[in-house]
């Protein structure tokens, strides 16, 4: 029996040593913190039950990894130890009882609490108020000299402020990278085609341990003090919290969430509050640190081999876990975006059981190098959708399969389009795809499109949910009798909707093109298309080269147009709409030598337009040769005034400028 336990211990120690080096020395962890904690807890349990098997080189007897050879070594005068962990209120109660049993007369009623920052522990030595040395924690006894790098961190004072500081004082704290700085750093790396950091902790560690301090200087690092080590030449407060305030007065930053609390129940409430607000904080944390506030009590309680007896880290539920990627399904969003969704072996992470996670897009799949069958690290933070952040490469099975993005929409089988320079792949079946149905119909009847009065969002949603319509053409097949089955839709309201649909059949080519919901074809672009090609048939048949000749249309919009009209299903819906009576007046072609009706005219738009969108009206006027300006002057030739026109109309009247209505504008366009 003892032999099998011995083998288990040796395997655990070897595994923990390996991952400690990956985490503390190489800044390249392969497993999440929760997995390392679990292995350590297993080791401690076996060693506690079999004390004769404890060895001097066990991970339980040390704090971290050895320093790299690239930095000179610094021996800590007082060891920089780590903390024991609590994972529940029961663990916290047990911690408190251990202290009470060991020091029954000590002042254990007051606590100093702070968020447990996810960064790199450092020691700062000030002599006569000047920073002379900075070191990493290393293995707790020996760290790395990172003085030149630390000098580049703006939140760390090179000289202490105020007065009264000790002749020699060692300040300990955490160097970290705020979330905003981390996001910006990775964004810049992507633009340069460089490797991105997995998380802010890795970014902070990698930045702080650069051999070239000029690189560190460019990284958005920050620092919060959390304790004091060596002190010579002055007496400090007997309160841990008051020492924080003294350090702050000397110019050393402390975490603003640090609190002095008077009971263990207050500590538990503090933990819950910080956990609730975790995702709103500017920095990554993975728990709270709880310390006895009284320094004399700390000295009485003392230390075990690897941690103080007077402090503990109360960890949050794990936000990262390892699980299996069983499959990948592709979902189609309301705008046609196709998103790969990882189907996972269910795992409890971030307080919930997770079985699905987003993989975002094909670029993200390539960046992760993930395959079906991989063991993956899954992360869930707060309300953020769970996502895969890394692959555990050494667990990849031989049967792992590549993830292949579909060429056809998994919902409607239309072609999938991915424009060069865009990360997202999209379904091109905008008018027929069930996944996009509600948004396509809402857009089709909107005021700037066919403007169907009375056919609002809730009515559209009911029509789709009850499977009464599939495409925009189906709207014109509805009868008043059918519509009355909808909620809050009586006979009169239903008849009004039918009348509005019939009225909407009389439109313009520009509005019709806009109503189709083709990506990036807005009112102005639709108007430019209508004025350039004159007929729907020519728009549908236009090649990429012909489309880019149209004003304001580039390669991307041209690709969207050709993709849309190349789909037979989309063209079939367009044909149905025409057959059902949707029509518009013909746009007369203008001969090359014929002057445009508003050629050279300076035109101003004012007031509210009920039939045209402002950008649509502006594009139409420009197509007729006008120069559209924003203010009325003596140079203005025509003012088109909509409803509730104000000072521009008054000024135009005073100047004797020709004034026309929106109806005049529509007639001119037609």
Swiss-Prot record:
The keyword Cytoplasm does not apply. PROSITE patterns: BRCT, DNA_LIGASE_N1, DNA_LIGASE_N2. Zn(2+) binds at residues 409, 412, 427, 433. Its cofactor is Mg(2+); Mn(2+). The active site is at residue 116. Its EC number is 6.5.1.2. Residues 593-670 form the BRCT domain. NAD(+) binds at residues 33-37, 82-83, 114, 137, 174, 291, 315. It catalyses: NAD(+) + (deoxyribonucleotide)n-3'-hydroxyl + 5'-phospho-(deoxyribonucleotide)m = (deoxyribonucleotide)n+m + AMP + beta-nicotinamide D-nucleotide. InterPro entries: BRCT_dom, BRCT_dom_sf, DisA/LigA_HHH, DNA_ligase, DNA_ligase_AS, DNA_ligase_CS, DNAligase_adenylation, DNAligase_N. It is an enzyme of class 6 (ligase). Keywords: DNA damage, DNA repair, DNA replication, Ligase, Magnesium, Manganese, Metal-binding, NAD, Zinc. It comes from the Bacteria. GO terms for molecular function: DNA ligase (NAD+) activity; metal ion binding. GO terms for cellular component: cytosol. GO terms for biological process: DNA repair; DNA replication. SUPFAM superfamilies: BRCT domain, DNA ligase/mRNA capping enzyme, catalytic domain, Nucleic acid-binding proteins, RuvA domain 2-like. DNA ligase that catalyzes the formation of phosphodiester linkages between 5'-phosphoryl and 3'-hydroxyl groups in double-stranded DNA using NAD as a coenzyme and as the energy source for the reaction. It is essential for DNA replication and repair of damaged DNA. Belongs to the NAD-dependent DNA ligase family. LigA subfamily. This is DNA ligase.
């Amino acid at each position: 029996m003892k032999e099998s336990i011995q083998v288990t211990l040796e395997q655990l120690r070897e595994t923990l040593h390996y991952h400690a080096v990956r985490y503390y020395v190489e800044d390249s962890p392969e497993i999440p913190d929760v997995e390392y904690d679990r292995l350590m807890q297993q080791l401690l349990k076996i060693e506690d039950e079999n004390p004769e098997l404890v060895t001097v080189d066990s991970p339980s007897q040390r704090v971290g990894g050895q320093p790299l050879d690239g930095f000179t070594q610094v021996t800590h005068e007082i060891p920089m130890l780590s903390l024991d962990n609590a994972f529940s209120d029961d663990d916290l109660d047990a911690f408190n009882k251990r202290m009470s049993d060991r020091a029954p007369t000590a002042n254990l009623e007051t606590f100093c609490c702070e968020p447990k920052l996810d960064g790199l522990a450092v020691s700062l030595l000030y002599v006569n108020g000047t920073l002379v040395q900075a070191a990493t924690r290393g293995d707790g006894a020996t760290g790395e000299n990172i003085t030149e790098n630390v000098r580049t961190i703006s939140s760390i004072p090179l000289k202490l402020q105020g007065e009264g500081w000790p002749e020699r004082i060692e300040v300990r704290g955490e160097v970290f990278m705020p979330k905003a700085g981390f996001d910006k750093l990775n964004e810049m790396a992507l633009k340069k085609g460089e490797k991105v950091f997995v998380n802010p902790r890795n970014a902070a560690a990698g930045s702080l341990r650069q051999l070239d301090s000029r690189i560190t200087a460019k990284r958005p690092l920050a620092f919060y003090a959390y304790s004091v080590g060596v002190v010579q030449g002055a007496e400090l407060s007997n309160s841990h919290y008051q020492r924080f305030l003294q350090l702050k007065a000397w110019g050393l930053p402390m975490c603003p969430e640090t609190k002095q609390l008077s009971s263990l129940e207050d500590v538990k409430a503090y933990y819950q509050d910080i956990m609730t607000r975790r995702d709103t904080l500017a920095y990554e944390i993975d728990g709270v640190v709880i310390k006895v506030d009284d320094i004399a009590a700390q000295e009485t309680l003392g230390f075990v081999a690897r941690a103080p007896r007077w402090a503990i880290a109360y960890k949050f539920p794990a936000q990262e876990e390892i699980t299996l990627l069983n499959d990948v399904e592709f979902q189609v969003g309301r705008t046609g975006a196709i998103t790969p969704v990882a189907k996972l072996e269910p795992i409890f992470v971030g307080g919930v059981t997770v079985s699905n996670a987003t993989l975002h897009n094909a670029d993200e799949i390539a960046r992760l190098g993930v395959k079906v069958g991989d063991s993956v690290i899954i992360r869930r933070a707060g309300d953020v959708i769970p996502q895969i952040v890394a692959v555990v490469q050494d667990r990849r099975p031989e049967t792992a399969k590549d993830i292949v993005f579909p060429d056809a929409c998994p919902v409607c089988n239309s072609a999938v389009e991915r424009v060069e320079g865009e990360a997202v792949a999209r379904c091109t079946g905008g008018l027929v795809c069930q996944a996009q149905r509600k948004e396509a119909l809402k857009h089709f009847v909107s005021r700037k499109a066919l403007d169907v009065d009375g056919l609002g969002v809730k009515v559209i949603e009911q029509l789709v949910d009850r499977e009464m319509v599939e495409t925009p053409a189906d709207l014109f097949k509805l009868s008043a009798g059918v519509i009355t089955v909808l909620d809050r839709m009586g006979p009169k309201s239903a008849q009004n909707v039918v009348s509005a649909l019939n009225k909407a059949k009389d439109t313009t080519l520009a509005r019709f093109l806009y109503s189709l919901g083709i990506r990036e074809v807005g009112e102005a672009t639709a108007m430019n298309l209508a004025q350039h090609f004159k007929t729907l048939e020519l728009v549908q048949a236009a090649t990429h080269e012909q489309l880019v000749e149209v004003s304001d249309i580039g390669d991307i919009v041209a690709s969207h147009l050709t993709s849309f009209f190349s789909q037979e299903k989309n063209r079939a819906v367009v044909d149905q709409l025409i057959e059902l009576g949707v029509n518009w007046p013909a746009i007369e072609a203008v001969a090359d030598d014929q002057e445009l009706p508003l050629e050279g005219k300076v035109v101003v738009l004012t007031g509210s337009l009920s039939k045209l969108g402002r950008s649509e009206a502006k594009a139409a006027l420009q197509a007729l040769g006008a120069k559209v300006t924003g203010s009325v002057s003596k140079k203005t030739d025509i003012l088109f005034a909509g409803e509730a026109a104000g000072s521009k109309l008054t000024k135009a009247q005073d100047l004797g400028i020709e004034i026309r209505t929106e109806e005049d504008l529509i007639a001119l366009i037609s």
